[in-house]
Curated annotation (Swiss-Prot):
Keyword rRNA-binding: no
Any one GO molecular-function label of the UniProt entry: translation release factor activity, codon specific
Superkingdom assignment: Bacteria
Annotated family: Belongs to the prokaryotic/mitochondrial release factor family.
InterPro entries: PCRF, Pep_chain_release_fac_I, Pep_chain_release_fac_I_sf, Prokaryotic/Mito_RF, RF-1
N5-methylglutamine found at: 235
Phylogenetic classification of the source organism: Bacteria, Pseudomonadati, Pseudomonadota, Gammaproteobacteria, Moraxellales
Task of the protein: Peptide chain release factor 1 directs the termination of translation in response to the peptide chain termination codons UAG and UAA.
UniProt-listed PANTHER family: LD18447P
Pfam families per UniProt: PCRF, RF-1
Species this protein is from: Acinetobacter baumannii (strain ATCC 17978 / DSM 105126 / CIP 53.77 / LMG 1025 / NCDC KC755 / 5377)
The name this protein goes by in its record: Peptide chain release factor 1
Modification(s) after translation: Methylated by PrmC. Methylation increases the termination efficiency of RF1.
GO CC annotations, alphabetized: cytoplasm
Entry keyword Endoplasmic reticulum: no
Length: 362
């Protein structure tokens, strides 16, 4: 292992010890915001600290066994010990390499899930509803909570657009590779000739950004409108102007929230979504400027970037970014996304490791 990597791992262990002490400090405990921030950092460093500890212990065990080899009575046993620990070192070093991949600070955050019908008319809206159900089922299996912020229902079912907040531990990190265009190939219920139609929906996953965290929005840049929330068929959900639409004038970004009966709650939720949209756009622009030449599995979230095809006649789902095809479409649409998401994360880790190796001269 390189000396520079050892030094970095020792520094991280020192920081972990420092955080452990800070989290026991009464002053830190009384400051909820600081306590949460430090707890998250402590949690992020715990695994890497434990693995590094095991690595150093294995090295010590090899040294001890090397000394034992000089005694004929223990030579064979010492050799076995050395070989076992060398194999363990390889395994632990692989784990450390993965753990050293720079983490997106937003990975542990809640996320906004936005699904919009694209080409395909009514069938695209129906498929938007199918995707929403798929993600809802997966969220339920993870113990996450989904809260719909706004929805525009399709005339024959599904959604022209649905925006929701997904709350839970590590939601954004788990779902961030879902942004892009999702294509469906199937025979619509309204198709009398049995022909397969192709439709598309777009999915966007945005990390929730803490409104109080280094985000400055000039109130003069906002236009806030209220209106009556409408359900399917234009029926009024309530008779007060509780729904809120906020427009960020400089960027033209528009957000809405209509699900709460309280205008105040709708405004707060719309504002949180606006902050996340603006911060995500800013980050995407920065990423584009600094990483034009490298492959990025996460993608830009560009709605024209086709990432996946759901083919119903063949019962398959294909993710085009990693050339993965799974013949279990029914299970996937019921929220069984574990194999798919794990595959995407493994590919991302492999990309990052290759990039780190290149940066470190192999």
């Amino acid at each position: 292992m390189k000396a520079s990597l050892r030094l970095r791992l020792d520094q991280l262990c020192d920081r972990h010890e420092e955080l452990t002490a800070l989290l026991a400090d009464a002053e830190v405990i009384s400051d909820n915001k600081r306590f949460r921030k430090l707890s998250r950092e402590h949690s992020d460093l715990t695994e890497i600290t434990e693995v590094w500890g095991k690595y150093r212990q294995a090295e010590e065990d090899i040294e001890t066994a090397e000394m034992m080899k000089s005694d004929p009575d223990f030579k064979d046993m010492a050799e076995e010990e050395i070989q076992a620990n060398k194999a363990l070192l390889e395994e632990l070093e692989s784990q450390l390499n993965i753990l050293m991949i720079p983490k997106d600070p937003n990975d542990s955050n809640a996320a906004y899930l936005e699904i919009r019908a694209g080409t395909g008319g009514d069938e695209a809206a129906i498929f938007s509803g199918d995707l929403f159900r798929m993600y809802s089922k997966y969220a339920e299996s993870q113990g996450w909570r989904i809260e719909v912020l706004s929805e525009n229902e399709g005339e024959h079912g599904g959604f022209k657009e649905v925006i929701c907040r997904v709350d839970g531990d590590g939601v954004y990190g788990r779902l961030k590779f879902e942004s892009g265009a999702h294509r469906v190939q199937r025979v619509p219920a309204t198709e009398s000739q049995g022909r397969v139609h192709t439709s598309a929906c777009t999915v966007a996953i945005l990390p929730e950004i803490d409104v109080d965290t280094n985000v400055e929005i000039n109130p003069a840049d906002l236009r806030i409108d209220t209106y009556r929330a409408s359900g399917a068929g234009g029926q009024h959900i309530n008779k007060t102007d509780s729904a809120v639409r906020i427009t960020h004038i400089p960027t033209g970004t528009v957000v809405e929230c209509q699900e709460e009966r309280s205008q105040h709650k709708n405004k707060a939720k719309a504002m949180a979504l606006l902050v996340s949209r603006l911060e995500n756009a800013k980050r995407a622009a920065a990423d584009a400027a600094t990483s034009e030449m490298r492959r990025d599995l996460v993608g830009s979230g560009d709605r024209s970037e086709r990432i996946r095809t759901y083919n119903y006649p063949q019962g398959r789902m294909t993710d085009h970014r990693i050339n993965l095809t799974l013949y279990k479409l029914d299970a996937i649409m019921e929220g069984d996304l574990t194999e798919l998401l794990d595959s995407l994360h493994r590919e991302y880790q492999a990309d990052q490791l290759a990039m780190l190796a290149q940066e470190n001269g192999g």
